[in-house]
Amino acid sequence: MTKSQVNTWGPAISSPAELTVIIVGLGIAGLTAAIECHRKGYTVIGLEKKPDANQLGDIIGLSGNSMRILAEWNNGSLAHLIDDDITCDVTALELFDAEGHQRLAMPYNANDPNQGYLFRRTGLLTKLCHYASQLGIDLRFGVNVDGYWETDSSAGVYANNEKITGDCVVAADGFHSKARAIITGETPAPEDIGVVAYRSIFDADAIADVPEAQWILKKAQTADIWHTYYAKDTMVAIGTAARGRYVHWGCAGALEDRSESWMQPAAPYPVLKCLESWPVGGQLAAAIARTPPGKCFQQALRAIPPLKRWVSTGGRMIVIGDAAHSFLPYAGQGGNQAIEDAAVLGICLELAGTPNVPLALRVVEKLRHGRVSLIQKGSVEAGDCFLDAAWESDDTAERPTAFTHQAWVYAHNCVEHAYKQFHAAAEAVINGREYTPTNVPTDGKFRQQDGKCM
């Protein structure tokens, strides 16, 4: 699809080199936005307060709706992003009860868009950062952004006593975004859902001398495993990555030890205490108890209601990713929707042209807000299913599953959708009309099962 085919609305597209995009936050949303904007020919300045691209976390899944975007990079090859060291090579997601009985084994294929690849989060971010650097994108780490500003013709930030100017600012600074309130004027109150999450990933050498933990390495060097154990109000996922080089585990439940919503270092003792009452607990504890110091993190899960808007009053600043729509982890879509945001951002800037940056950002909001808000709400619904293990229920919808299968989420092509819907959304912005999203189910409901889009 060429520019001449898609840019049928408004003035001709200006030279891409005339547009400078400032991106604050270089996590998954920020790095993919930087790459997508660079691919359109724009000048990108990426700012990150941390000294490098490393982030806390264990495993992240990217399904077909985001992988199709990454697959367009590097001449259509994913080889630069996918290797054995950063992926989980699993052939099945195995589900167990607290007795240790296997209840379900769901075949897993990374090439299935409803499933996708499982990555070590830090490994994926390192790959994204390396690729962006190879492209020559200006990435600046260790930079503290102190303020945001915009005029009718430009926007920028104050960082490390420097005023940085561009045509627009994209804030991808995460769940605890400082930019959110400045850009949107909103400070939504997080809802405590009564769940604490623990997570860890560490070198498998830590369990090498533990006979009771060797079950987790049964496929090491040839494949990985992924086991999820469900009990009332608590679930534990445990497995390997990089064909047995790493052990990862996560626990979410109504545990006694409560923390702030910030992810922070912790010891796994509350998890081990919980497992004492599980018949299978000793098997799991054999590995979890060997978590090295500094490798376990916890946080209280909090649900944030959807924002009313993502774009600043002047139209030259926007929030994306977790800064715009933080998800609970149960929907498995946080990283995926951040990547969709990034791709749609690049397309809207391309189609609107340099003189129309405010229009471009407002169209991004029109195209993305309804979709991610519904998934955001749905992540709470998904959490209820994960933590209410009704193995004996006659209603299959009440039994635990490893993932949901909504085609409108996993099979969505946000690139094709953005090109097709840009003009309708742009006209809605210009004329002050409501825009009806076409990338959500017709009845506007999330559902654990599938729903058809308009």
UniProtKB/Swiss-Prot annotation:
Its cofactor is FAD. InterPro entries: FAD-bd, FAD-dep_Monooxygenase_BioMet, FAD/NAD-bd_sf. The keyword Secreted does not apply. The chain crosses the membrane at residues 15-35. Notoamides have been shown to exhibit antitumoral activities. Notoamides A-C show moderate cytotoxicity against HeLa and L1210 cells with IC(50) values in the range of 22-52 mg/ml, but the IC(50) value of notoamide D is greater than 100 mg/ml. Moreover, notoamide C induces G2/M-cell cycle arrest at a concentration of 6.3 mg/ml. GO terms for biological process: alkaloid metabolic process. It catalyses: notoamide E + NADPH + O2 + H(+) = notoamide C + NADP(+) + H2O; notoamide E + NADPH + O2 + H(+) = notoamide D + NADP(+) + H2O. Its EC number is 1.14.12.-. GO terms for cellular component: membrane. It is an enzyme of class 1 (oxidoreductase). SUPFAM superfamilies: FAD/NAD(P)-binding domain. It comes from the Eukaryota. It is found in: Membrane. Gene3D superfamilies: 3.30.9.30, FAD/NAD(P)-binding domain (3.50.50.60). Pfam families: FAD_binding_3. The active site is at 199, 229. FAD binds at residues 48, 61, 121, 322, 335. One of its GO terms (molecular function) is monooxygenase activity. It is a single-pass membrane protein. Keywords: Alkaloid metabolism, FAD, Flavoprotein, Glycoprotein, Membrane, Monooxygenase, Oxidoreductase, Transmembrane, Transmembrane helix. Belongs to the paxM FAD-dependent monooxygenase family. FAD-dependent monooxygenase; part of the gene cluster that mediates the biosynthesis of notoamide, a fungal indole alkaloid that belongs to a family of natural products containing a characteristic bicyclo[2.2.2]diazaoctane core. The first step of notoamide biosynthesis involves coupling of L-proline and L-tryptophan by the bimodular NRPS notE, to produce cyclo-L-tryptophan-L-proline called brevianamide F. PANTHER family: MONOOXYGENASE, MONOOXYGENASE, PUTATIVE (AFU_ORTHOLOGUE AFUA_6G12060)-RELATED. This is Notoamide E oxidase notB. It comes from Aspergillus sp. (strain MF297-2).
